[in-house]
Amino acid sequence: MKICIFIFFYIFSSIFYVLAKNNQVDNITAIVNDEIILNSDVNEILVFLKKSKKKFIIPLKSDFLKEKVLEKLIVDSLILQEANSKNINITKEQIDTVIKNIALKKHISVDHFKKQILLRNIKNPSYYDNFIKKIEILLKMKTIQDYELHKRINISEQEVNTIFKKLIKDNEKFKKINLSYILLPSLKQDSDNAVRNRTKIAENIVYKLKKGYDFEKLLIECEKNKSTFIVKKMFWKPLLDIQNSFFKTLNIFKKGQILGPIVGDKGLYILKVNDIHHKKENIVTEFYMQHCLIKPSVILTNTEAKKKIFNIYENIKKGIYTFDDAVKNLSDDYYSSNKKGDLGWISKESLGFDLNKKFLILDKNEISEPVKSNWGWHIFKILDRRQVDAFYKLKKNQAFNIVLNQKIISEKNHWIEDLKNTAYIEIIRS
């Protein structure tokens, strides 16, 4: 429902959550184990929803919106209690990352964003601290949720392949086919003998073609005999239209394919597939690469890691040692260092960070200047490059994500039901 989605959006985008109310006189709306939800907690969200001026499709039931808000607060309380019971702690770095990301999305500096938060409630000196606390609570909830779902979700290759095949089949609708055909036209008044003769001619033509006879040469020959044949060359037509003209199961899958004889409205057709165009093909550049990685750690700061990788780069350039020596003795990627830093074929899109123009024009066996990624500092060596159609790879990933999202929704619901079944929940009607 739209209303549930928006409540979820509000809770997370405004970074609102119910904090314990100390020494505050208020009506208790619900008890969740040893925690309480106050009437003011529910009303605070309801006021926000009204101020947002969003239009909701709400059933006639007068308390529907209030009940949905309360239901969300109960679930959040259960999740937070579960996180606390598992002793989940959030670091200052994690909170700082959230603040940086919010500021980045708003296209402002972190300091400017902090000032915005403080200006929302100048009279309350602890407002910013409460804001930070709310971020911490949300991160706790997300951490325990991710942990639980990771335990519960299993995805089999068969499940992914089922969706993958459906996506590929759906994509067939977007195919365009370049065809040439020879038509042996029929007339309503044709005798049985004429039909048999025409069928025999068509079958002989197909037999010759499958034995290697040149289709273009045959087109020229048939064009001369206009009383028997109609010829059409090199035209594009959507696969869906071709199937509608003949039959739904017509399977066109490769260039040079000969189809026929096929019965159509106007007679017997012999088709040749000249080309196939996938509307959604996705050509990407892949690089065959090795790398040397230096990772920041508890004992090595990012600045020190950067200095170390640039020293390695300079030493390779000066010939003090080779790239392979650096990988074997200095790289922090222990898995690939035993394979000379071999990363295999990787597209620039899958690396997870932007490559500069200098990198993209490197020659084979040339090393890159140090590059920063989420994992640390790299020196890459380009062994080869190629262009590939990533369509099927993308569709496989899409299929996996569809299955994953379905399971996330399903398993999250199961998990919440498990939390409810083992909890004491009392809703107090006023």
From Swiss-Prot:
PROSITE patterns referenced in this protein's UniProt entry, alphabetically: PPIC_PPIASE_2 (PS50198)
Signal sequence bounds: 1-20
Gene3D superfamilies assigned: 3.10.50.40, Porin chaperone SurA, peptide-binding domain (1.10.4030.10)
InterPro entries linked to this entry: OMP_Chaperone_SurA (IPR050280), PPIase_dom_sf (IPR046357), PPIase_PpiC (IPR000297), PPIase_SurA (IPR023034), SurA_N (IPR015391), Trigger_fact/SurA_dom_sf (IPR027304)
Cystine crosslinks: none
Catalytic activity: [protein]-peptidylproline (omega=180) = [protein]-peptidylproline (omega=0)
Domain PpiC positions: 174-275, 284-384
One GO cellular component term: outer membrane-bounded periplasmic space
GO BP terms in the entry: Gram-negative-bacterium-type cell outer membrane assembly; protein folding; protein stabilization
E.C. designation(s): 5.2.1.8
GO molecular function: peptide binding; peptidyl-prolyl cis-trans isomerase activity; unfolded protein binding
Predominant subcellular localization, coarse grouping: periplasm
Entry comment, domain topic: The PPIase activity resides only in the second parvulin domain. The N-terminal region and the C-terminal tail are necessary and sufficient for the chaperone activity of SurA. The PPIase activity is dispensable for SurA to function as a chaperone. The N-terminal region and the C-terminal tail are also required for porin recognition.
Matching PANTHER family: CHAPERONE SURA
Protein name, as recorded: Chaperone SurA
